[in-house]
Swiss-Prot record:
Chain residue ranges for the region called Allosteric domain: 933-1068
Binding sites annotated in the UniProt record for Mn(2+) 2: 298, 300
Residues bound to Mg(2+) 4: 835, 837
Binding site for ATP 2: 710, 749, 751, 755, 780-783, 823, 835
Record's function text: Large subunit of the glutamine-dependent carbamoyl phosphate synthetase (CPSase). CPSase catalyzes the formation of carbamoyl phosphate from the ammonia moiety of glutamine, carbonate, and phosphate donated by ATP, constituting the first step of 2 biosynthetic pathways, one leading to arginine and/or urea and the other to pyrimidine nucleotides.
Name assigned to this protein: Carbamoyl phosphate synthase large chain
One Pfam family linked to the record: CPSase_L_D3
This enzyme's EC code(s): 6.3.4.16, 6.3.5.5
Catalytic activity as recorded in UniProt: hydrogencarbonate + L-glutamine + 2 ATP + H2O = carbamoyl phosphate + L-glutamate + 2 ADP + phosphate + 2 H(+)
GO cellular component: cytoplasm
Residues that bind Mg(2+) 2: 298, 300
Keywords for the protein's UniProt record, in alphabetical order: Amino-acid biosynthesis, Arginine biosynthesis, ATP-binding, Ligase, Magnesium, Manganese, Metal-binding, Nucleotide-binding, Pyrimidine biosynthesis, Repeat
Organism: Clostridium botulinum (strain Loch Maree / Type A3)
Gene: carB
Length: 1068
């Protein structure tokens, strides 16, 4: 069936901000889908609130609306654009839920919009737990014994009937939000209350636990004629009980017999035929390891995290094919873009092994509960490809950037066998290293398999790796012969991993490899196991005989990607990498990307001329450089991951385009940077590195409180704190020195001023600032967690001129060629520099979109020697637009048990949304709604607990809230303060006092919003921490910054209404 000619204009709903459970994979699938629809001559209208995406670029869709993803705003877009069709399955759970809501409210029918692809009825059968169970029962597909409940009493009754443990799965939620495994009635009470609250339809599935069964996934495509193909089957190494997003996954499955494989494949096809899927669908099974018994866990009737992985693992562009199916094509009419010979009805075959390992944020959150369960906690993932499981797995380990190049983790040497058992029975992010230590101590393999639920096949593979590691530890370099080294390299061991165990340098192994001619070759991912010639140059390394890479003599540049999504280094850097590649291609330069993230646009097969899916380590990057011999390598767009390679590449005499390793060091080394500032006569807050608590107290006497204290050599504000008095300072310093005595602690005078930020481009002579950004929260809140406003609202002309002057001095002083990011503080009329990053920053996509300056394109051309004055955007500060745009951070702290919520110098947000308006209030209103902050709630009850430093500032805000009609609940001191000002307040007992106390008011739903300004940010033993956590876990708004609160109150008093707001197409 060819293209449906009735489809002229399609609305695509994006997935919104990056949160745990919904990350960059939807930028990748959304971009692919939009391009797939556009190339058929159909107009694409996009709504998505996330400015950090390629998907929201004006080249991807015909009309781009960066607006909140709510029914009200989508309806506005529909009314303005009049699309005839809606493509619902490309925006993750957010897009799906919105499509169902638009349908149920009759908006689609009223506006004459047809849902193309999978129908709303089919989506409901896949998403609504009860409807899904009914379909499974009708087609005789087994499901786990379960009950749908809408209240706690019925839930408890069912659990008592089937026995504990039980699994709680809320309907229409993301990444297992609100779910969990309840081992007792007390745990069930808590999980069920939350699950019912977060489910958009107040419905939860309770099911008997099959914890320990194998978890198997099938990625299936189906067209409107009922043709089906299974694109990929994947096996979770971790058993059922750990969310698939937190599991290590291998493709194709390694331990299924042919009978099991065919049985589950037939079941997958049976299920998607019965539900009537048109497009892609992910089916998850639980398989009893001791029999042929299986049960269907759930399906995702849309593209998903797993479909992004399946796409990258096979080279089959699932999202693009799904979009074509939605337009009316059948699988036998859609050409395979990789081979250009076969069609989408050919099932991919793999002659290699793919491993996905999640990337968790626990380096940022030391106090977090790391135990993995049914609720996803990973922020991102890496993918590795090898010719055998061991090679793919070890590549995966070193891709995680956790400093591990083998399965040895020194801290587990100190653990007793009982402690190790605990770490694998209640598995956390480090369970593989604990398991390896057990095998190192000769713990029986069958016992390890029994207590972990991991198949003996994988345990054997881990055992082989551990045995080789032990042999290396007991050997010297002279024992390493050519055959042994070749065998180790073939199985994925890195030079550094081998060298560490032999106690020599990686350079020694590198030299030996070169003497013996042991170098990697590169194989192609071609979707067809080499059966047809592939046109997509998409490669992985292996130690083999035949090399499939054709090296050209063209002018070429390698772009280093940014690796897995994590807090502090998100999708913004992938955006920058992709735009760099596009700029190079326009200039006729061959582009090569090296990256290892399966979720991103940069690793799509047709973005660059060549893609190497490899770890971003020194050895793996050097192998590619030696193979390709590029004219240069670009590190500026890959975040800290890429920048870290600068020194090594310089030592190897590899030409780095743009800013050099020495210049990077000048910006990042505190002493060199201070010398430069002194020479340029630029101020920074006074400060010093100290080595003891006594030194710290002495230094603070000179500086005066408050001071900002932080460890040296950290990223993303890790471990920073603002202290206001001696007691707080002593507490922080003694803890910090206990953790690390090797490096100094930096103490700076904390200036409570206005924070201002610029991304600038320098060509070595001139500087262009596309836009000066102002932070809403005063300095002290990490720039990634601040609300950012552009154009600035409170910055004088004089200060702007000084910003340009300082930016030019710094860029030329360091010698920047390309991008530079500078953060300033304006305090009492003076301007201070607080940080300089000699690379692209996380604000690049935001400022590119709202200033309309193609920053990455210009920076790339400047790196290649062009001059700013010749590129048409002039120099200096670019002209400001009329519209105001705010970037509002989005947090995933609800997903991470025992993690601090309050804003501070350490970054915690996972994503961002954009709010665009004619006034600041309009822009902020949209930003808050897009970030799901409770801005719309009409009058309610506020629980206020205010730190002594903030009480004076809080009073006028409280009066305003009171005058709007809010009621207050507070503990004794805050309550007294409010009463003195004539504000009615209900006093509650403190946490340590008897019930009913402050936590009970939160648990009993007596509160709508919590305002809590913290005392000691990082101390999880304090009341404030428990208050904030209790509120977040109940889906309540928590505000810890008075600046944010002021902005909200200001908007509330203006009484902005959705219906009066304009929407803006940013593609013009």
């Amino acid at each position: 069936m060819p293209l449906n000619k009735d489809i002229k204009k399609v609305l695509v709903i994006g997935s919104g901000p990056i949160v745990i459970g919904q990350a960059a994979e939807f930028d990748y699938s959304g971009t692919q889908a939009c391009e797939g629809v556009k190339e058929e001559g159909v107009e694409v209208v996009l709504i998505n609130s996330n400015p950090a995406t390629i998907m929201t670029d004006k080249e991807v869709a015909d009309k781009v609306y960066l607006e909140p993803l709510t029914v009200e705003f989508v309806e506005k877009v529909i009314a303005k654009e009049r699309p005839d069709s809606l493509l619902a399955g490309m925006g993750g759970q957010t897009g799906l839920n919105l499509a169902v809501e638009l349908y149920d409210k009759g908006i689609l029918k009223k506006c004459g919009v047809n849902v193309i692809g999978t129908s709303i009825e089919s989506i409901k059968e896949g998403e609504d737990r009860e409807l899904f169970r009914n379909v499974m029962s009708r087609i005789n597909e087994p499901v786990i014994q379960s009950e749908i409940v809408t209240d706690i009493e019925n839930g408890k009754a069912f659990a008592n009937k089937i026995g504990y443990p039980v699994i709680v799965r809320p309907a229409y939620t993301l990444g297992g939000t609100g779910g969990g495994i309840a081992e007792s009635e007390e745990e069930l009470d808590e999980i069920l209350a939350l699950g019912l609250q977060v489910s958009s339809i107040g419905q939860v599935l309770l099911e008997k636990s099959v914890k320990g069964w194998k978890e198997i996934e099938y990625e299936v495509m189906r067209d409107s004629r009922g043709n089906c193909v299974t694109v990929c089957n994947m096996e979770n190494i971790d058993p059922v009980g750990i969310h698939t997003g937190d599991s290590i996954v291998v493709a194709p499955s390694q331990t299924l017999s042919d009978k099991e494989y065919q049985m589950l494949r037939s079941a997958s096809i049976n299920i998607i035929n019965s539900i009537g899927i048109k497009g892609g669908c992910n089916v998850q099974f639980a398989l009893n390891p001791n029999s042929f018994e299986y049960a269907v866990i759930e399906i995702n009737p849309r593209v998903s995290r797993s479909s992004a992985l399946a796409s990258k693992a096979t080279g089959y562009p699932i999202a693009k094919v799904a979009a074509k199916i939605a337009l009316g094509y059948t699988l036998d009419e859609i050409k395979n873009a990789v081979t250009q010979k076969t069609y989408a009805c050919f099932e991919p075959s793999l002659d290699y092994v793919v491993v996905k390992i999640p990337k968790w944020p626990f380096d940022k959150f030391q106090g977090a509960d790391r135990v993995l369960g049914t609720k996803m906690m990973a922020t991102g993932e890496i993918m590795a490809i090898g010719s055998n499981f061991e090679a793919a797995f070890l590549k995966g380990i070193r891709s995680l950037e956790i400093g591990k190049y083998s399965l040895e983790h020194k801290k587990f040497r100190e653990f007793s066998m009982e402690e190790l058992k605990t770490r694998v029975i209640s598995p956390d992010d480090e369970r593989i290293f604990a398991l390896a230590e057990m095998l190192r101590r000769d713990y029986r393999m069958d016992k390890v398999a029994e207590i972990t639920g991991i198949d003996k096949f994988f345990i054997k593979k881990f055992r082989w790796i551990v045995e080789e590691e032990q042999r290396l530890i007991l050997s010297k370099i002279d024992d390493l012969d050519k055959e042994w080294l070749y065998k180790l390299k073939k199985k994925g061991f890195s030079d550094k991993g081998i060298a560490d165990m032999l106690n020599i340098s990686p350079e020694d192994i590198y030299k030996l490899r070169n003497i013996w001619g042991i170098n990697p070759v590169y194989k192609m991912v071609d979707t067809c196991g080499g059966e047809f010639e592939a046109l997509s140059p998409y490669y992985y390394s292996t130690y083999d005989v035949y090399d499939e890479v054709e090296v050209s003599k063209n002018k070429k540049v390698i772009v280093i990607g940014s690796g897995p999504i994590r807090i502090g280094q998100g999708i913004e850097f992938d955006y920058a990498s992709v735009h760099c590649v596009k700029a190079l291609k326009k200039l006729g330069i061959e582009t090569i990307i090296v990256n290892n993230n399966p979720e991103t646009v940069s690793t799509d097969f047709d973005v660059s001329d060549k893609l190497y899916f490899e770890p971003l380590t020194e050895e793996d990057v050097l192998n590619i450089v030696e193979k390709e011999k590029p004219n240069g390598i670009i590190l500026q767009f890959g975040g800290q991951t890429a920048i870290k390679l600068a020194k090594f590449l310089k030592e190897k005499n590899i030409p780095i385009l743009g800013t050099t390793a020495g210049q990077i060091d000048m910006a990042e080394d505190r002493e060199k940077f201070d010398e430069l500032l002194e020479k340029l006569q630029i101020s920074r807050p006074k400060g010093k590195g100290i080595w003891s608590v006594e030194d710290g107290l002495e230094e603070t006497k000179k500086l005066g409180f408050p001071v900002l204290v932080r460890p040296s050599y950290v990223l993303g504000g890790q471990g920073m704190e603002i202290t206001h008095d001696e007691k707080e300072l002593v507490y922080y310093l003694s803890n910090a020195f206990q953790k690390n005595k090797k490096n100094p602690i930096l103490i700076d005078k904390y200036l409570m001023g206005r924070e201002i930020e610029v991304d600038a481009i320098s060509d070595g002579e001139d500087v262009l600032i596309p836009g000066i950004m102002e932070h809403l929260e005063r300095a002290g809140v990490h720039s990634g967690d601040s609300i950012t406003m552009y154009p600035t609202q409170n910055v004088s002309k004089d200060i702007k001129e000084k910003i340009l002057e300082y930016t030019k001095k710094l860029a030329l002083g360091i010698g920047i060629k390309g991008m530079i990011n500078i953060q300033f503080i304006e305090f009492e009329g003076n301007l201070y520099v607080i940080e300089v990053n000699p690379r692209a920053s996380r604000t690049v996509p935001y400022i590119s979109k709202v200033s309309k300056v193609p920053i990455v394109d210009i920076a790339t051309r400047v790196m290649l020697g062009e001059k700013l004055n010749d590129l048409g955007y002039r120099v200096g500060v670019y002209k400001e637009p009329e519209l105001i745009s705010v970037k509002v951070p989005v947090f995933s702290t609800q997903k991470l048990p025992r993690v601090e919520v309050c804003l501070g110098p350490e970054m915690k947000s996972t994503g961002e949304v954009l709010g665009v308006g004619k006034t600041l209030e309009e822009a902020l209103y949209k930003g808050f709604i897009g970030a799901n902050m409770s801005i719309k709630k009409e009058k309610g009850t506020i629980l206020a607990t205010i730190n002594d430093h903030d009480k004076e500032e809080f009073l006028p805000i409280a009066k305003k809230l009171h005058s709007i009609g809010y009621k207050f609940i507070a503990t004794s001191k805050t309550a007294e303060l409010l009463k003195e000002e004539g504000i009615e307040v209900k006093q509650v007992r403190k946490l340590k006092e008897e019930s009913p106390n402050i936590i009970d008011t939160i648990k009993n739903d007596e509160v709508d919003l919590v305002i809590n300004t913290p005392t000691k940010g990082n101390d999880s033993k304090r009341d404030g921490f428990h208050i904030r956590r209790a509120a977040i876990e109940r889906n309540l708004g928590v505000i810890t910054s008075l600046d944010t609160l002021k902005a909200i109150v200001n908007i509330k008093s203006k009484e902005i209404k959705d219906e009066t707001l304009h929407i803006f197409d940013l593609s013009n």
